[in-house]
C-alpha cells in the first residue's frame, strides 16, 4: 500500500503467499516423489520470479541480471559439491582449472559460498549497470546474461561446458527448500 509516496509494509501481504506455499508444500509435495520434484522446481522458480519482481517492481527498470547471478551461483554450488573423483575423471572436466578440482563441500556450505560469490559479482556489475535506465539498462543486463551464459557454457576451465555435471547432490527435503525460498 502507498501512503504519501511511501510504501507501507503490510504483514498480510507477506504472510498470505507464505501460508499458501506452506500448505501446498505439505499437501502436494508429500504426495509422491514426482510431485515433490515438481514442488521443488516450483519453489526455485518462485524465488527467481520474486527476485525479478523485487527489483523491477521497486525500480521500474527492466533487468535480466538476476538470471546471470543465479547462473553464477548455481555453477559455483555445483562445482563445489561435485565429488572430486568425478571432477578428475569426467570427460568434459579434464581441462578444469586446478584450484576448482580439489574443493568439495556439502550442499548447505556451497549455498552460502555461492550466494557470496554471486553477490560480489552482482555488487561489482550492479554498481556499473545501475547508472543506466530504460531500454539501455535492459539491453546491458541482457548482455550481462549473454556473457555469463557464454562464459559458463563454452569455457571448460571453470566448468563442464555444455555437458552435464554428474554427481551433484540434491536437496531432497522439500521443507528445507521451502525455508530457503521464504
Regions found by a protein language model. Give the residues of each.
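Transmembrane alpha-helices and adjacent helix-loop boundaries
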Residues: 1-182
Amino acid at each position: 500500500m502507498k501512503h504519501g509516496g511511501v510504501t507501507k509494509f503490510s504483514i498480510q501481504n507477506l504472510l498470505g503467499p507464505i501460508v499458501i506455499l506452506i500448505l501446498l508444500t505439505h499437501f502436494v509435495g508429500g504426495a509422491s516423489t514426482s510431485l515433490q520434484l515438481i514442488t521443488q522446481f516450483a519453489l526455485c522458480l518462485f524465488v527467481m520470479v520474486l527476485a525479478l519482481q523485487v527489483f523491477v517492481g521497486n525500480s521500474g527498470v527492466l533487468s535480466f541480471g538476476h538470471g546471470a547471478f543465479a547462473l553464477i551461483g548455481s555453477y559455483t554450488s555445483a562445482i563445489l559439491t561435485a565429488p572430486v573423483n568425478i571432477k578428475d575423471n569426467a570427460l568434459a572436466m579434464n581441462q578444469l582449472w586446478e584450484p576448482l578440482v580439489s574443493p568439495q563441500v556439502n550442499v548447505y556450505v556451497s549455498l552460502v559460498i555461492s550466494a557470496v560469490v554471486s553477490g560480489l559479482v552482482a555488487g561489482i556489475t550492479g554498481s556499473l549497470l545501475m547508472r543506466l535506465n530504460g531500454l539501455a539498462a535492459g539491453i546491458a543486463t541482457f548482455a550481462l546474461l549473454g556473457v555469463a551464459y557464454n562464459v559458463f557454457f563454452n569455457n571448460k576451465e571453470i566448468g563442464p561446458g555444455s555437458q552435464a555435471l554428474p554427481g551433484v547432490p540434491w536437496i531432497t527435503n522439500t521443507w528445507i527448500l521451502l525455508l530457503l525460498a521464504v
